[in-house]
Amino acid sequence: MKFASSAANVTGKKYASCEAATWLNEHFLSSLGDIRKAVDLFFLAGINHVYYHGTCFSPQNEPWPGFLFYAAVELTPANPLWRDFSGLNKYIARVQSFLQQGMSDNDVLLYFPIFDRYADYGRGMLEHFDAISPAFNGTPFRTAADEMIKKGYGFDYISDLQLTNTVPLEGLLQTEGNVYGTLVVPGCKYIPVETFSHILRLANGGVNVIFLGDLPENISGWADVEEKTAFFESLKSGIRFAPTNNPQVMKASYGSGSLLTGSNLEQLFTFAGIPRETMTDHGLAFVRRQNLNGTVYFITNDGDKPFDGWLSLQAGGTSAAIFNPTDDRTGLAKTMVGTGGGTEIYLRLNPDESLLVQIYETGQKGRLYQFYDPVSSPTLVSGTWKVEFMEGGPSLPKPFEAGSPVAWTSQEGEDYDNFSGTARYTGDFTKPPLKADSWLIDLGMVDHSASVTLNGEKVAVLPGPGYSFIIGRKLLKTNNTLLIEVSNLMANRIAWMDRNGLPWKKFYNVNMAARLRENNKNGIFDASDWKPVESGLPGPVKITPLRKAR
């Protein structure tokens, strides 16, 4: 993913766009929550424009599921999840509205050693370079990229041609469209002599260049090999590394700049004065951009534990604001000046939750972004739950009642197992006798998306992966009715069709290939052996009184 965004960032392009989630899971097994988590990874990699994938025209009167082709998430109106697709689209639109402003703000350029791959003998006639293939596993290049992501260093890949178009600028590297603090050349075996010579010119102009591991061993290619090799060796012979006050860093002064080498990348960055974002130590991931207002961060919690505390950011400013792309809540952040002139903000992030943080260079006025603390333990929404099937097929199962929310696939009967569509869960509850500023409604487990109506007012569309939301205290009455419309995957109905030999792979040149070998029968996808995918609202549904955090 960073291949595309790096090219855009280095050359100063406004957009880095991608086809997203096409083969996320096997056909019919991707939820909107799965897509949301995948799209977050695209954003973190520097992508700022998502267009999902193509989908084919299907006549209105075509029997379900209409015309489908190989794009495995099958985002079409025939998919029950289409009802709640707007929730995911609004989230993506809010994030993109920030990430499409300004320019990327990465500190490091990582040289892509393409000639090491060219020199390696492989089994195939063609190797694709649309991602970091397994062939890079264990290489200094892959190790450096993984470590920078883990340690919180923003970086872009750079090619030989892009590097030769880069010039020194007051100790920094100015590419065709951006500025960076240093260049990392990961221990590569081969490099064009023209590239190596230009790297030394950058150092001569004041840039600090990091050679991770050692200098390149040899030149690439066979054209004028003797002449180029002699020139390459003469350049290397003019480099004299000497110890520094850091035993893990060797330095060679070169003109106005320097060449650094060592095996510990973090120590090399520290010596070169390249800062990192320490939020990654807390299981958080980020992408950072500069815009007209200052600096914006897109931050996600990739870990399995909630984050609650002060977060140090490298960007300096006079104020900050928080924007929640999931529910559109906004407000100013509590801030203080951090060490080194950066900003510290108070933040809470649950696992799989994302926030946008805008650091402003000028003071901003407004209300604080509101975090909440629970007043008491959650209360279960118990009692009789009515379940009615609204739309879908192959037929609408009979309605049923249960003492708590349950998956409809837990009911006896093939109609429940085969159904793909939407069911309405209705539960009544009494407001707990507690004072609260707001209330948290948590649906528990949802299979696989939901829209929620409280006392006749639509209050949430929940595509996942999270299924909780906050409501104002005035929305909760003494006696309340909660309607939860749950939509599941296409999988169960498709499996029923395959078991019964009903044709649906009918679109010309459909290319309906299976992603997994066990689903490939006679060279085409087949779901007839699938067991029912759990569907509905296993819950439990809980409500929690909240007070404003001080």
Question: What are the roles of these predicted feature ranges?
Answer:
Residues F469-N479, M490, K542-L546:
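Short, surface-exposed tryptophan/glycine-enriched loops
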Residues M1-T422, T430-A436, L462, G472, ...:
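Carbohydrate-binding surfaces of carbohydrate-active enzymes
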Residues V459-F469:
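Aromatic-rich membrane-interfacial microdomains
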Residues S354-V357, W439, L476-K505:
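Short, well-structured beta-strand segments enriched in hydrophobic/aromatic residues
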Residues L349, V452-L454, L475-L476:
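Short, well-ordered loop/turn sites that connect or cap secondary structure elements
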Residues S312, F429-N455, L462-P463, L482-V486:
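Aromatic-lined ligand-binding clefts that engage carbohydrates, nucleic acids, or primary amines
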Residues G363-G383, V387, S487-P540:
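Glycine/proline-rich low-complexity spacer/linker segments in large multi-domain proteins
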